[in-house]
Amino acid sequence: MRASQFFLATQKEAPQEAELASHKLMLRAGLIKRLGSGLYSWMPLGLRVLRKVETIVREEMNRAGALELLMPAVQPKELWEETGRWAVFGPQMLKIRDRHERDFCFGPTHEEVITDIARREIRSYKQLPLNFYQIQTKFRDEIRPRFGVMRAREFVMKDGYSFHTSLESLQQTYDTMYQAYSNIFNRLGLKFRAVRADTGAIGGDGSHEFHVLADSGEDALAYCEHSDFAANVELAEALAPEHPRGEPKEPLREVDTPKQTTCEDVAALLGISLQQTVKSIAVVATDEAGNSQFYLLLLRGDHALNEVKAAKVPGLSSFRFASELEIREYLGCPPGFIGPVGVSTQVNVVADRSVAVMSDFVCGANKPKLHLAGVNFGRDLPEPMIVADIRNVVEGDPSPDGKGCISLCRGIEVGHIFQLRTKYTEAMEATYLDENGQKQFMEMGCYGIGVSRIVGAAIEQGNDERGIIFPAAMAPFSVAIAPIGYDKSEAVQSAAHALYDELSALGIDVLLDDRGERPGVMFADLELIGIPHRIVIGDRGLKEGQVEYQARTAASAETVALADIVSIVRQAL
């Protein structure tokens, strides 16, 4: 492609509202243009990147045996009412009404539509398993669209759905999709991790997320460098300490803490380790009879509550944090001084595993401006009603697989696979006849990739002060030819054209910058848009039969023979 025939729309500065590096750079590089809040046009340069991602996704899905189809973006209300999601999906769903006053939505996802297809078309076990996918624009009415394509209202997604006669068959396809996703991200040249994840609102059983690693990632991940263990922090198990609880050595005593309402402040006042303090978190849950139950969740002072884990404790599936009024009612003191000692039988105490082995610890006294020191289970308060893993793991915790220690990093979720089982097929009565002629509900899997989100995530992972550093598989062009004095030197023009033709004939994506711009402007643009390889041609070098070659990730250029440049580029690619 000749730059004079292309549309390059680079900018020196990014709009002030752009926060993430990817958002700033995509706007500056002219990959996207903002139309409205969370709405972006993919410009020719950006669309080349997006299409390359789509191609790799499509190739790997086809290789895995999935069948591509395309479903309507607009979906009728009636389908969503069958699963109950019309009422519960929330304001993220864009609801529309046609001229006949019939309600529809602009699809945020397609479980209902594909299940409707399955129940209409699949009759026998002989037709299963089947695995469908589509690459399509989705819409979710984000309350605060931000971060460019990372959290846009309109986005491109690959969503896939599989149907099976058994859990074993579902597991086989699930494993195949796991490998296909790994292949996709490896081919894209991204550093990523697949982690066990919570199934969330979509529901079901098994679930894995695929995260591109980036310091700006919204999600915290736990992994072990010495094994394959990796999980979202929401699910990473914090093992119980191996050491037993120590014997009491200190007497129980009250300590004045007039202004200290946090574990950090109390530890600083008393000159003790934060690990010797216990924080008490008051929550309220509703039991099966509809009655409110008050709980104290006990955590070590240096640990943080994991709400996903806590919700899995019996009785806490729908807990909420207690109000100040409720705390005063049950414990008789304001927040900041609450603790488990001396509480009534109406207060249910749940201790994290790390708290259960503590002795001589410090906690709130349930009296204003007072804490207790030298607290011990069995002597000063009963053993906890429940001991469970309710905290986030921290750096250095033992890995749950016993093969080393946990490390933490940040990630951007770009893919998610679920074992939905019969959640949707039961709701929509999607059945088949088994070998005995009996009706059975189909088992179902769900597999999503944020295609447009991948572009933003790749830029978050690869950028510097000069601009974007695209992986080779995603770059809009593989090679840029930068001729100096193009509009003034026939020798430069001739060499540039010859090299352009030779590389293009080899099937290499080449951008020939024939705009006649000054070298500084030309180099800045080519670095900004992230082309992996640059060849500079000038009169001075041509006299010696040489050109300059520089990889986007290299600190400086190197002088090479013009006769060797094609083989150098081919080897680099």
From Swiss-Prot:
It catalyses: tRNA(Pro) + L-proline + ATP = L-prolyl-tRNA(Pro) + AMP + diphosphate. Its EC number is 6.1.1.15. PROSITE patterns: AA_TRNA_LIGASE_II. GO terms for molecular function: aminoacyl-tRNA deacylase activity; ATP binding; proline-tRNA ligase activity. InterPro entries: aa-tRNA-synt_IIb, aa-tRNA-synth_II, aa-tRNA-synth_II/BPL/LPL, Anticodon-bd, Anticodon-bd_dom_sf, Pro-tRNA-ligase_IIa, Pro-tRNA-synth_IIa_bac-type, Pro-tRNA-Synthase_IIa_type1. Its main location: cytoplasm. Belongs to the class-II aminoacyl-tRNA synthetase family. ProS type 1 subfamily. Consists of three domains: the N-terminal catalytic domain, the editing domain and the C-terminal anticodon-binding domain. NCBIfam families: PRK09194.1, proS_fam_II. Homodimer. This is Proline--tRNA ligase. It comes from Methylobacillus flagellatus (strain ATCC 51484 / DSM 6875 / VKM B-1610 / KT). The lineage of its organism: Bacteria, Pseudomonadati, Pseudomonadota, Betaproteobacteria, Nitrosomonadales.
